[in-house]
């Protein structure tokens, strides 16, 4: 396995933790590094404890790591919260850290503590052997040619040069040429790119962490793309606007998180009976209720699958990476148009708000549409009725006719299954143990498999879609002695869902419910009995 480095910047909200971190990611990309980053923050505007961390390598890296190469604290009393993440080789900088960095003194002549994050970047650049000219270029691109941030970066670099010479290039990176067309996008932005490429032209949302990034991204794109983006007064209005847009012929989507999606459930049901294809971007966070608004979890799988009252068709997609988020947007729009059903794209805070190096595909995707008459057509009309209705949209109550309509509607699921993205297997044909996972946990599992001394004994099966379930999935488990389920919730909702479709009981599960991601180091430790 190639060397993967992990840097973490910590401090209070308002100290520029994320802005400094994103600048670091751009510097890494310019050095030809593959990366994935992630921020954690409380529900506070100022104070508290915020973090930004990035894991990177000259070869592809799938997940953030738990163990740190370098930790840098912008204020006192912060680095101590991360002692369990340190190793004997970790470097720790800060005002009260083992390697003292007097940020207050360094930023005083520059303009104050607002520049502490860029001073920190200078120290990081020194330890990793970054090219200062490349760092200067990224700072200029982010700020301006005469930005004090240039002075701040040089102050940090020079201080490290004068005081930490023993750590010069200690983590020397293997520089590559920058990847052409590579972007740094978070999961919501990746979905947004796919939404635009897939012909999406209407989006409505009421801000709710962690889905808000998609609203911000698409709102900016109104200036350059034929898309309407609305921010109404609440989640019910958002969903209703998307339904109206779909009725009028738009390729429409709405975004929210768990609590907002709970309010939208009647709209999901309406789409199911009125044959309206709307995409729901559901970025989950820990519940119940307000829960942990700025943390991550995979606790909404069953909520998504069984959303809406009554029995009707819906589709649930569960992308696991930034590239899959891009693809899921295109697939969701096409599936919604092909089958005229609600499509839920289920992600979480980890994927929605982590950023990764990503190169958009150059191909133009096929845009699927369903032939139907739109409101205002001269020769006909279409009624979208929330009552049970016949094929012309007229309400019905006759027992035999109702049974016929319901049976015909539900039979569509057999056709839908054929168009869904299939489970993807990673690993050796010799594997005797199979890991099942869905959504963002795929990233940590892939990274863990890359860290194992004997990965040939373990396989991974990732589900990029989970509803409708294909009963034939059960056949994929038969060759394996052990079936393990890894997901970021307390009750193993994937196990519950699979057991509802066919006999299923995993050998073991690795679950998490503290609002933090599952890290590859945890998975490696968990897998030890299965690789020995």
Which sequence ranges carry the predicted segments?
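Short alpha-helices
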Residues: 96-141, 489, 493
């Amino acid at each position: 396995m190639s060397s993967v480095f992990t840097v973490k910047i910590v401090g209070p909200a308002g100290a520029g933790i994320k802005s400094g971190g994103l600048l670091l990611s751009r510097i890494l990309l310019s050095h030809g590094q593959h990366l994935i980053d992630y921020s954690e923050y409380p529900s506070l505007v100022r104070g508290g404890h915020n973090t930004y961390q990035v894991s990177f390598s000259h070869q592809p890296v799938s997940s953030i790591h738990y163990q740190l190469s370098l930790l840098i604290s912008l204020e006192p009393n912060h680095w101590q919260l991360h002692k369990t993440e340190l190793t004997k080789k970790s470097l720790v900088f800060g005002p009260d850290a083992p390697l003292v960095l007097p940020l207050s003194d360094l930023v005083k002549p520059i303009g104050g503590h607002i520049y502490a994050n860029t001073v920190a970047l200078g120290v990081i650049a020194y330890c990793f052997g970054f090219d200062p000219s490349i760092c200067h270029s990224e700072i200029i691109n982010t700020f301006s040619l005469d930005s004090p941030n240039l002075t701040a970066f040089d102050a940090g670099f020079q201080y490290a040069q004068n005081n930490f010479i023993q750590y010069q290039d200690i983590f020397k990176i293997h520089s590559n040429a920058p990847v052409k067309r590579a972007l740094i996008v978070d999961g919501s932005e990746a979905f947004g790119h796919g939404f635009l490429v897939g012909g999406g032209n209407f989006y409505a949302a009421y801000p709710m962490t962690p889905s808000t990034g998609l609203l911000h991204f698409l709102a900016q794109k109104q200036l350059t793309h034929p898309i309407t983006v609305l921010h109404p007064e609440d989640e019910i209005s958002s969903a209703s606007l998307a339904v109206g847009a779909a009725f009028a012929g738009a390729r429409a989507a709405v975004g929210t998180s768990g609590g907002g999606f709970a309010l939208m459930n009647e709209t999901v049901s309406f789409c199911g009976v009125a044959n309206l294809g709307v995409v729901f971007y559901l970025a989950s966070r820990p519940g119940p209720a307000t829960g942990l608004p700025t943390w991550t979890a995979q606790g909404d799988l069953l909520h998504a699958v069984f959303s809406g009252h009554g029995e009707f068709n819906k589709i649930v997609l569960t992308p696991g990476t930034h590239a899959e988020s891009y693809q899921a947007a295109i697939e969701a729009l096409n599936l919604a148009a092909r089958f005229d059903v609600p499509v839920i794209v289920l992600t979480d805070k980890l994927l929605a708000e982590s950023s990764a190096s990503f190169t958009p595909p150059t191909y133009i995707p096929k845009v699927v549409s369903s032939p139907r008459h739109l409101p205002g057509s001269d020769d006909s009309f279409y009624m979208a009725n929330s009552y049970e209705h016949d094929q012309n949209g007229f309400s019905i109550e006759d027992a035999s006719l109702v049974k016929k309509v319901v049976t015909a509607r539900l039979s569509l699921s057999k056709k839908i299954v054929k168009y869904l993205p299939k489970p993807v297997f990673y690993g050796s044909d010799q594997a005797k143990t199979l890991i099942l996972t869905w959504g963002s946990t795929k990233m940590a599992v892939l990274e863990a498999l890359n860290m194992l001394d004997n990965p040939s004994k373990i396989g991974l099966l990732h589900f990029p879609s989970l509803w409708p379930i294909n009963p034939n999935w059960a056949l994929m488990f038969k060759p394996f002695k052990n079936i393990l389920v890894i997901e970021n919730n307390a009750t193993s909702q994937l196990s519950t869902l699979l057991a509802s479709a066919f006999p299923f009981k995993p050998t073991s599960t690795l679950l998490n419910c503290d609002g933090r991601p599952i890290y590859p180091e945890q998975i490696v430790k968990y897998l030890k009995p299965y690789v020995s």
